[in-house]
């Protein structure tokens, strides 16, 4: 009895640690997520659709195909779309790490169109969200774009020249390609305080760059110190020829420029059996003049030609001619040999002068993000945007990507495992049954009292799912131990009723066991922050 009591206390302590860790993780995540849009609720009133005539495309609050999760959907083909969300407070990019992340699913593929986001800088006075269009100034443009030869994940920084005051688009060189499947993918851009940029797709690093490197951005953020002098001109006597014909060379006396390249082969002989009197083609004896043929209008009718059947067994027909062969005396046009040019000065270049627009830069002049917009002409429908996140911590975004966005990768692996490990999965079905048997026995414990009905309801709900989930089992255990805690430490006070039925909004948390196991295998030990709460969905 004493041993059982000790085990019970250990279980209680373990569950307490788990609950405390979850609370701390949630607090950390909420503080690091500057902006998060899950599209669980309708976007109307929060996201503003452009009222410009150029953007007739209709946005829809729709579920992803085969999922219970909602997103922002491009609903029609060959339409221009524009929608924007103004942030409560502009996000500064100059200090600390900033993570830009979102999910997109190309449900019908992407032949020609974009699925990128525009992170708008503060607009001029008088600008309204209803007037959002392609001229609305942005700070960063990020996301997939594909059309014709273009197939890349854009990252464009619109940077203000500190000398001229002009804004210049700086494109990331050699960006990663867009995944070609129709699954959900997470696109992440991490802007670090050391001027480093990291692009990830589904949590996997695809590109690393430095904002101040001329090898990573075109044009470079920092201009060159010198430029070619636009007023400098090449001297008239400047000789750029490295080689010249030898002026002292003469053509040899035996060099015949008129000799032909080919001559008749005088040694050739006509093959035996050659039919000199037989033509190579003859009139088709089976051809008949058409009845509607009019000689006056169509001309004299002639039978079509066919190959002479007599020539098939002979080496040839018709007049025999000697074949040609290469002329051994042929040398072609004579040219003087080339020698080094004594007057050669090299390829002329204008002299370099100090660049009047040069400036030094320790950090890019990032403009704040005041709004997030989607604006493009899409030839495909079925583009679904979801889980748009701006965070100040990489772990928050990484956790979000692993738990919410890397479904495509996890489900590919899962499907491979289902085929490979079918015998193992058959064994797991027996384990599932045993687990539910234990849970039903726990539900019959006397101390549950009034809570027994709720616990049974939750167990039955989990059992009716296609596959049980670890999340549901853990929830049941936590509820039971929470009741036990109150019984042990709550004194004589009546235990309040516990609502153990998950909220309707969070019911989809009971997702597939294999998916959860897959997520657990992919988690790394360094993850400590949790993503904003979100209903998971699966890709099929």
Swiss-Prot record:
Glycosylation sites: 467
One GO BP: ERAD pathway
Domain of life assignment: Eukaryota
Binding site for Ca(2+): 38, 69, 386
Compartment list: Endoplasmic reticulum membrane
Stretches the record annotates as P domain (Extended arm): 227-360
Placement of Sequence repeats on the sequence: 229-240, 246-257, 265-276, 284-295, 299-309, 318-328, 332-342, 346-356
InterPro entries from the UniProt entry: Calret/calnex (IPR001580), Calret/calnex_CS (IPR018124), Calreticulin/calnexin_P_dom_sf (IPR009033), ConA-like_dom_sf (IPR013320)
Annotated stretches, region: Disordered: 221-301, 499-540
The keyword Nucleotide-binding is assigned to this record: no
Gene3D superfamilies noted in UniProt: 2.60.120.200, Calreticulin/calnexin, P domain (2.10.250.10)
Record keyword Cell membrane present: no
Name assigned to this protein: Calnexin homolog
């Amino acid at each position: 009895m004493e041993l059982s009591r000790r085990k019970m206390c250990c279980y209680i302590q373990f569950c307490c640690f788990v609950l405390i860790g979850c609370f701390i993780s949630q607090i950390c995540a909420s503080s690091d997520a500057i902006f998060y849009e899950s599209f669980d609720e309708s976007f109307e009133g929060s996201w503003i659709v452009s009222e410009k005539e150029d953007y007739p495309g209709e946005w829809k609050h729709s579920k992803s195909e085969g999922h219970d999760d909602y997103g922002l959907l491009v609903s029609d083909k060959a339409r221009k779309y524009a929608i924007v969300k103004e942030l409560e407070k502009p996000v500064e990019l100059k200090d600390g790490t900033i993570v830009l992340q979102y999910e997109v699913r190309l449900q019908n593929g992407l032949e020609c169109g974009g699925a990128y986001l525009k992170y708008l800088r503060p607009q001029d006075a008088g600008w309204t969200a209803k007037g959002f269009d392609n001229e609305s100034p942005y700070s960063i443009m990020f996301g997939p774009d594909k059309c014709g030869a273009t197939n890349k994940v854009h990252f464009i920084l619109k940077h203000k020249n500190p000398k001229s005051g002009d804004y210049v688009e700086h494109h990331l060189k050699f960006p990663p390609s867009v995944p070609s499947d129709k699954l959900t993918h997470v696109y992440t851009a991490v802007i670090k305080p050391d001027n480093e940029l990291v692009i990830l797709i589904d949590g996997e690093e695809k590109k690393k760059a430095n904002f101040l490197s001329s090898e990573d951005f075109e044009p470079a953020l920092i201009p060159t110190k010198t430029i070619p002098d636009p007023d400098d001109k090449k001297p008239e006597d400047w000789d750029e020829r490295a080689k010249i014909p030898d002026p002292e060379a003469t053509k040899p006396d035996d060099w015949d420029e008129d000799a032909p390249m080919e001559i008749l082969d005088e040694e050739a002989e006509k093959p035996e059996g050659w039919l000199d009197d037989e033509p190579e083609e003859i009139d088709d004896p089976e051809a008949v003049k058409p009845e509607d043929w009019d000689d006056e209008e169509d001309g004299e009718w002639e039978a079509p030609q066919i190959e002479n059947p007599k020539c098939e067994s002979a080496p040839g027909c018709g007049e025999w001619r000697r074949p040609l062969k290469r002329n051994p005396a042929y040398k072609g046009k004579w040219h003087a040999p080339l020698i080094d040019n004594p007057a050669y000065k090299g390829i002329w270049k204008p002299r370099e002068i100090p660049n009047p627009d040069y400036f030094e830069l320790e950090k890019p002049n990032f403009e704040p993000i005041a709004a997030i917009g989607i604006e493009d002409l899409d030839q495909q429908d079925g583009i679904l945007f979801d889980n748009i996140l701006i965070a100040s911590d990489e772990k928050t975004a990484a956790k979000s990507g692993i738990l919410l966005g890397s479904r495509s990768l996890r489900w590919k692996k899962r499907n491979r495992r289902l085929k490979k490990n079918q015998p193992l999965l058959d064994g797991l079905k027996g384990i599932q049954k045993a687990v539910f048997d234990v849970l039903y026995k726990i539900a019959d414990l006397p101390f549950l009292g009034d809570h027994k009905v709720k616990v049974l309801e939750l167990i039955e709900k989990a059992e009716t799912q296609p596959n049980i989930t670890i999340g549901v089992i853990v929830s049941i255990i936590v509820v039971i131990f929470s009741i036990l805690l109150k019984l042990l430490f709550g004194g004589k006070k009546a235990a309040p009723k516990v609502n153990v039925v998950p909220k309707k909004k969070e019911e989809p948390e009971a997702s597939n066991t294999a998916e959860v196991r897959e997520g657990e295998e992919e988690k790394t030990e360094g993850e400590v922050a949790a993503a904003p709460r979100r209903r998971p969905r699966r890709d099929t």
